[in-house]
């Protein structure tokens, strides 16, 4: 699982 917070927090 990869999570990013730019610009919104999204996890795949």
UniProtKB/Swiss-Prot annotation:
The modification Histidine amide is found at residue 12. Expressed by the skin glands. Keywords: Amidation, Amphibian defense peptide, Antibiotic, Antimicrobial, Disulfide bond, Fungicide, Secreted. GO terms for biological process: defense response to bacterium; defense response to fungus; killing of cells of another organism. Disulfide bonds join 3-11. It is found in: Secreted. It comes from the Eukaryota. Its main location: secreted. GO terms for cellular component: extracellular region. Antibacterial activity against B.subtilis, E.coli, S.aureus, M.luteus and P.putida. Antifungal activity against S.cerevisiae. This is Tigerinin-2. It comes from Hoplobatrachus tigerinus (Indian bull frog). The lineage of its organism: Eukaryota, Metazoa, Chordata, Craniata, Vertebrata.
């Amino acid at each position: 699982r990869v999570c990013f917070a730019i610009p919104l927090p999204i996890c795949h």
